[in-house]
Amino acid sequence: MSELHKAFLRRIKEQETALGLSGLVDEDDIPEPAVMPPTGNSSSTANTEDETILRDYKQFKETNFIQEFYENELGHKFKTYYKPSKKPGSILFCHHGAGSSSMTFGNLVNHIEDESVGIFLFDTRGHGESVATSDFSLDTLVQDVSFVLEQFSSKHQQTSIFLLGHSLGGAVLAKYSTLYPSDILKGLILLDIVEEAAVQSLNAMPSFIARRPLSFPSLSKAISWHMNFLLFNEKSARLSVPDLFTDKLTWITDLNATQPYWQTWFSGLSENFLGFKGPKLLMLSTHESLDKQLMIGQMQGKYQLVVFKNNEKSGHFVHEDLPNHVAVCLTDYIKRAVAPEIFMKEDLGVVPKWGGKINK
């Protein structure tokens, strides 16, 4: 077994352990999913806490975004959130992963302080407030991006768009950039997603889904569960978790319904990412995720790599766990891509003495 293969297996084992899973457990040994029982806390206390969480969550949406539904010709509706830039500049077009929603980027939005960067989020089909569907194929998700981005561009004439995708969202945007090349696409950013590691980690998904509670007694308990198993930042969780549940605190997204498409989601991801012509940024929670194609691409200087491997308070949702760190990386990357000479001079204090231009 190669060292690279061993690294992949270690990565998968770490992910299973972090999620409370065991790769040695047979399917017959997996317990039935349970409804999380109520605790000794009084219902009035839980209700008060939930009311506070929901109030802040709704206020955050109303204060920060222009909210719209985009409806395609098939009647599929997509919930969108747009925070315009205060100064002329670029748009960060964000795509979340499977089982998540646009609000996974909520706290990150709070930390992006560059007034020349606008932010656009949307709930992909069957997630958040977008309409449910039975088709979760990669090609369909790419078509959804094409529709949503066309609608957005027709409403808000933009000439500079950076694509940011987390997990599955990264695979969708990487393929979109390959199928729909455009001069307005200035950059491609992937958050904690690598093809080979992603494909292998899918082996743990059935166990993870089977062990999740089917519902929660309160929203605060749902947040606590996420903090115990998936997230490290409660401020982020209070914005992202409410978007995952119905009024009855059951999961909005049926991840089991997506299973037929899992094996195709990440096919060709590394090739699509490296094939993008503009500046590329890959942010990972650990170095062990890099596959052979990305290792070669990194050595050839084809993309920028940022790894948060030394921080124990971050995991797969690195943008939720470390929103300030990720925001700084994003804004620096965008500045450097748009105007490298200005970035070098004003942000780094470096002025090239040879009189030439700095390559992007």
Swiss-Prot record:
Residues 26-50 are annotated as: Disordered. One of its GO terms (cellular component) is mitochondrial small ribosomal subunit. GO terms for molecular function: protein C-terminal methylesterase activity. Keywords: Hydrolase, Serine esterase. Its EC number is 3.1.1.89. It is an enzyme of class 3 (hydrolase). SUPFAM superfamilies: alpha/beta-Hydrolases (SSF53474). It catalyses: [phosphatase 2A protein]-C-terminal L-leucine methyl ester + H2O = [phosphatase 2A protein]-C-terminal L-leucine + methanol + H(+). The active site is at S167, D192, H316. Pfam families: Abhydrolase_1 (PF00561). Belongs to the AB hydrolase superfamily. PANTHER family: PROTEIN PHOSPHATASE METHYLESTERASE 1, PROTEIN PHOSPHATASE METHYLESTERASE-1 RELATED. This is Protein phosphatase methylesterase 1. The lineage of its organism: Eukaryota, Fungi, Dikarya, Ascomycota, Saccharomycotina. The gene is PPE1.
